[in-house]
Amino acid sequence: MAVDMRILESLDQNAKLTVKELAIMLGESEESVAASIREMEEDHIICGYPTLINWDKTDRQLVTAMIEVKVTPQRGQGFDKIAERIYQFDEVDAVFLMSGGFDLCVMVHGKTLQSVAEFVSSKLSPMDSVLSTSTHFVLKKYKEHGLPLVQKIEDERMLITP
């Protein structure tokens, strides 16, 4: 399992690593690394290999929102059933069970503010068990998935001294 953890930690830092590169880094055979990865994929320990894209640097317009959702848990299923219904919408990027003032945090994306508002009003709010929602639009992303998205701008002004 120690090798599996080292594979996971390496892939978490750089999902582009090849089996060959991982094998060299870990001092293992390519076959054993490939088998470990395959097994972890089958067990849903490795669930995918997403790429982090800074959409603000492209021509594509994308609006991101965090929606606080208060729900009534269902008998015998708690929050799981409603969370499953919510995460199946294409607009939904992530759903988290939260502690505190609301139950679920739903991260969504859309082409416009209006498309996100339409999602909330026509799909999310009318669902059985949903008591209320509060939508917060992301204005700027500074860091995501542990990686900074903004570049430091060096101040090129000359210092003024008395």
Model-derived regions, located:
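A compositional/biophysical signature of low hydrophobicity enriched in polar/charged and small residues
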Residues: 1-162
